[in-house]
Amino acid sequence: GKMLDVPVGTAVFTVDKYKRMKKADIICLDYSQDMLDRVRYRFTEAKITDIKTLQGDVGAMIFHDESFDFILCMNGLHVFPDKDKAYSEILRTLKPGGEFLACFYVAGEKRISDWLVNSVLTRMGWFTPPFDTANDVRRRLEQYYEILDFNIEGAMLYFRAKKR
Protein backbone atom coordinates (compact mmCIF):
# COMPACT_ATOMS: atom_id res chain seq x y z
CA GLY A 1 0.00 0.00 0.00
CA LYS A 2 0.85 3.67 -0.02
CA MET A 3 2.52 5.08 3.08
CA LEU A 4 3.27 8.55 4.42
CA ASP A 5 6.09 9.10 6.91
CA VAL A 6 5.59 12.48 8.62
CA PRO A 7 7.81 13.98 9.90
CA VAL A 8 10.53 11.84 8.37
CA GLY A 9 13.30 13.61 10.28
CA THR A 10 16.59 11.94 9.42
CA ALA A 11 15.00 8.47 9.01
CA VAL A 12 17.47 7.11 11.54
CA PHE A 13 14.87 4.60 12.79
CA THR A 14 13.36 3.69 9.42
CA VAL A 15 16.11 3.62 6.78
CA ASP A 16 17.01 -0.04 7.32
CA LYS A 17 13.37 -1.10 7.10
CA TYR A 18 12.74 1.04 4.02
CA LYS A 19 15.77 -0.53 2.35
CA ARG A 20 14.03 -3.92 2.58
CA MET A 21 10.64 -2.60 1.41
CA LYS A 22 11.45 -2.65 -2.30
CA LYS A 23 7.86 -2.56 -3.58
CA ALA A 24 6.43 -0.10 -1.07
CA ASP A 25 5.08 3.25 -2.21
CA ILE A 26 6.45 5.62 0.44
CA ILE A 27 6.36 9.40 0.66
CA CYS A 28 8.44 11.11 3.34
CA LEU A 29 7.34 14.59 4.39
CA ASP A 30 9.07 17.07 6.67
CA TYR A 31 8.74 20.80 7.32
CA SER A 32 12.49 21.20 7.81
CA GLN A 33 14.65 21.48 4.70
CA ASP A 34 17.66 20.54 6.86
CA MET A 35 16.00 17.25 7.85
CA LEU A 36 15.13 16.55 4.21
CA ASP A 37 18.72 17.18 3.14
CA ARG A 38 19.89 14.74 5.79
CA VAL A 39 17.36 12.06 4.91
CA ARG A 40 18.16 12.35 1.20
CA TYR A 41 21.83 11.85 2.00
CA ARG A 42 20.98 8.86 4.21
CA PHE A 43 18.78 7.33 1.48
CA THR A 44 21.53 7.86 -1.12
CA GLU A 45 24.08 6.16 1.15
CA ALA A 46 21.65 3.25 1.64
CA LYS A 47 21.01 3.08 -2.12
CA ILE A 48 17.31 3.85 -1.66
CA THR A 49 16.09 5.52 -4.83
CA ASP A 50 12.36 4.87 -4.96
CA ILE A 51 11.12 6.91 -1.96
CA LYS A 52 9.80 10.41 -2.53
CA THR A 53 10.84 13.16 -0.10
CA LEU A 54 8.85 16.37 0.09
CA GLN A 55 9.00 19.58 2.09
CA GLY A 56 5.62 20.43 3.60
CA ASP A 57 3.46 21.19 6.61
CA VAL A 58 1.55 18.37 8.28
CA GLY A 59 -1.14 20.93 9.12
CA ALA A 60 -1.76 21.75 5.44
CA MET A 61 -0.80 18.74 3.35
CA ILE A 62 -1.05 18.83 -0.44
CA PHE A 63 -2.35 15.26 -0.73
CA HIS A 64 -5.86 14.30 -1.83
CA ASP A 65 -8.37 12.96 0.67
CA GLU A 66 -7.90 9.28 1.52
CA SER A 67 -4.50 9.01 -0.22
CA PHE A 68 -2.69 6.68 2.19
CA ASP A 69 -3.06 3.14 3.53
CA PHE A 70 -0.59 3.83 6.35
CA ILE A 71 0.63 6.97 8.07
CA LEU A 72 3.69 6.74 10.29
CA CYS A 73 4.37 9.60 12.69
CA MET A 74 7.49 8.94 14.75
CA ASN A 75 8.46 11.62 17.25
CA GLY A 76 6.28 14.17 15.50
CA LEU A 77 3.17 15.08 17.41
CA HIS A 78 5.08 16.73 20.24
CA VAL A 79 6.84 18.93 17.68
CA PHE A 80 3.91 20.07 15.53
CA PRO A 81 2.78 23.60 16.45
CA ASP A 82 -0.92 22.98 15.70
CA LYS A 83 -1.79 19.52 16.95
CA ASP A 84 -5.47 19.86 15.96
CA LYS A 85 -4.56 20.59 12.33
CA ALA A 86 -2.03 17.75 12.30
CA TYR A 87 -4.57 15.20 13.56
CA SER A 88 -7.19 16.57 11.15
CA GLU A 89 -4.89 16.32 8.12
CA ILE A 90 -3.74 12.83 9.06
CA LEU A 91 -7.38 11.75 9.34
CA ARG A 92 -8.27 13.42 6.03
CA THR A 93 -5.45 11.82 4.05
CA LEU A 94 -5.79 8.31 5.54
CA LYS A 95 -8.07 5.86 3.73
CA PRO A 96 -10.92 4.19 5.65
CA GLY A 97 -9.42 1.02 7.10
CA GLY A 98 -5.97 2.61 6.91
CA GLU A 99 -3.61 2.53 9.88
CA PHE A 100 -2.13 5.44 11.80
CA LEU A 101 1.03 4.44 13.71
CA ALA A 102 2.73 6.90 16.02
CA CYS A 103 5.09 7.38 18.93
CA PHE A 104 5.76 10.62 20.76
CA TYR A 105 6.14 12.34 24.12
CA VAL A 106 3.03 12.71 26.28
CA ALA A 107 2.76 14.94 29.32
CA GLY A 108 2.06 13.77 32.84
CA GLU A 109 3.73 10.35 32.77
CA LYS A 110 7.22 11.09 34.16
CA ARG A 111 8.04 14.21 36.15
CA ILE A 112 11.67 14.24 35.03
CA SER A 113 10.59 14.04 31.37
CA ASP A 114 8.04 16.81 31.84
CA TRP A 115 10.73 18.98 33.42
CA LEU A 116 13.20 18.25 30.60
CA VAL A 117 10.61 18.97 27.92
CA ASN A 118 9.42 22.21 29.51
CA SER A 119 12.77 23.52 30.74
CA VAL A 120 15.09 22.49 27.93
CA LEU A 121 13.58 20.95 24.79
CA THR A 122 10.80 23.50 24.38
CA ARG A 123 13.15 26.41 24.98
CA MET A 124 15.52 25.03 22.33
CA GLY A 125 12.63 24.89 19.87
CA TRP A 126 12.71 21.11 19.51
CA PHE A 127 9.30 20.52 21.15
CA THR A 128 6.21 22.71 20.78
CA PRO A 129 3.50 23.06 23.44
CA PRO A 130 0.76 22.38 24.26
CA PHE A 131 1.43 18.71 24.99
CA ASP A 132 -1.30 16.09 25.18
CA THR A 133 -1.57 13.53 27.95
CA ALA A 134 -2.16 9.89 27.02
CA ASN A 135 -5.85 10.36 27.91
CA ASP A 136 -6.05 13.39 25.61
CA VAL A 137 -4.66 11.29 22.75
CA ARG A 138 -7.03 8.40 23.48
CA ARG A 139 -9.99 10.82 23.34
CA ARG A 140 -8.74 12.25 20.03
CA LEU A 141 -8.39 8.79 18.49
CA GLU A 142 -11.57 7.15 19.79
CA GLN A 143 -13.77 9.47 17.73
CA TYR A 144 -12.44 8.28 14.38
CA TYR A 145 -10.32 5.17 14.91
CA GLU A 146 -10.40 1.69 16.32
CA ILE A 147 -7.42 1.64 18.69
CA LEU A 148 -5.45 -1.54 17.99
CA ASP A 149 -2.51 -0.88 20.30
CA PHE A 150 -1.89 1.82 22.92
CA ASN A 151 1.16 1.58 25.17
CA ILE A 152 3.10 4.00 27.33
CA GLU A 153 6.78 3.46 28.08
CA GLY A 154 8.20 6.16 30.31
CA ALA A 155 6.90 9.39 28.80
CA MET A 156 6.51 7.95 25.29
CA LEU A 157 3.19 6.84 23.87
CA TYR A 158 3.13 4.20 21.13
CA PHE A 159 -0.10 3.50 19.31
CA ARG A 160 -1.59 1.84 16.27
CA ALA A 161 -5.09 2.81 15.20
CA LYS A 162 -7.35 1.88 12.28
CA LYS A 163 -9.51 4.54 10.66
CA ARG A 164 -13.21 3.72 10.69
Residue spans for each PLM region:
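Class I SAM-dependent methyltransferase SAM/SAH-binding core
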Residues: 2-60
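A short acidic, Gly/Pro-enriched loop at the edge of an enzyme's catalytic core
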Residues: 59-70
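Short N-terminal helix/helix-N-cap motif within the alpha/beta-hydrolase-1
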Residues: 34, 81-85
